Every structure is written in C-alpha cells, then in structure tokens.
C-alpha cells in the first residue's frame, strides 16, 4: 500500500551465521591432526593412531599421510596411507632408510556460536559451515523456508531481500 520494501539478515546474529537447527556435523569446521614418529623399516600391525581432538563430540577423518623426515620433502615422497587404516588402526611397513612422521588429519566443529543473538538462544545456535552445500541447504530449509511460509504473499513483494554475507 505504501510501496515499502524490507529485508533482513538470513538468521539471528550476523549474516549466514546459523541457528538452533545447525548440529555439530553442519557447523563451521576446522582441520585438526595428530602425528606419530615411525622409524624406517618399522612394521606397524594394528597400530593405534591417536584421534585428533573433537569439539562437541564430532570428528571425521580426512586422510592419513606419511611424510619422510627431512628439511625439504618432495610432494611425490609423501605417502597416502588412508586406505591402510581401519577404525583408527594402521597396518603399514615403513620404507627403510629414513624415518617417517605419520599424520592423521580430520575435521571437527570450531564451536563458534552465532552472535549477536538473544541470550535465550545463544547456547543453542552454532554457526553454519559456509563451505558445505549440505549445511547451506539445511540452513535455508530450516531457517528461511518457515519465514517464507509465514510471510505468504508479502514474500518477494514487500519483503524483497535477504542479506547473505559470508
């Protein structure tokens, strides 16, 4: 009637932050790792690789790599041992002639909460993983679709934009 248009950030807090619908698997992630020294020629059979630290109880493996010790290492000398690991245990014979460091890489949530948001929801709101298609689709489905339904005919007319800035 007045020709006004309105928009908003897409969730409580700063733009593209998330909400209570974001679980640790869909929250912002960071890479974590542990390492283990292995002498050249050593035979590892079911050797436990320490699991990296997990925030909020969520952790997923990315890769297990063996890097020969030395000041300069050629990329071709790094060995991918991921397929030799089962349930965190490694089966591998380290090539003789040099010592190795085995790295177990994974990812876990950063634990970052949305902000600024009302105190009553802050502890339940994790920031979404902006690099994950699945997490972004979850955020749209759970955070924006209810708004679209509630606004009805005003969606796209009076309510004309949502800011996404991350």
Locate predicted features.
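Mature extracytoplasmic enzyme cores
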Residues: 1-166
């Amino acid at each position: 009637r007045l020709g006004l248009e309105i928009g908003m950030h897409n969730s409580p807090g700063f733009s593209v932050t998330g909400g209570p619908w974001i679980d640790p698997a869909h929250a912002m992630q960071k890479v974590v790792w542990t390492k283990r020294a292995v002498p050249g020629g050593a035979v590892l059979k079911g050797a436990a690789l320490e699991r990296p630290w997990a925030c909020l109880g969520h952790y997923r493996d990315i890769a297990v790599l063996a890097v020969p010790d030395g000041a300069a290492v050629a990329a071709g000398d790094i060995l991918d041992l991921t397929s030799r690991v089962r349930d965190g245990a490694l089966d591998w014979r380290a090539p003789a002639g040099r010592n190795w460091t085995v790295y177990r890489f994974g990812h876990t949530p950063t634990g970052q909460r949305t902000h600024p948001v009302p105190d009553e929801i802050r502890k339940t709101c994790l920031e979404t993983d902006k690099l994950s298609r699945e997490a972004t689709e979850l955020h749209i489905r759970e955070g924006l679709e209810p708004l679209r339904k509630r606004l009805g005919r005003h969606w796209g007319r009076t309510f004309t934009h949502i800011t996404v800035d991350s």
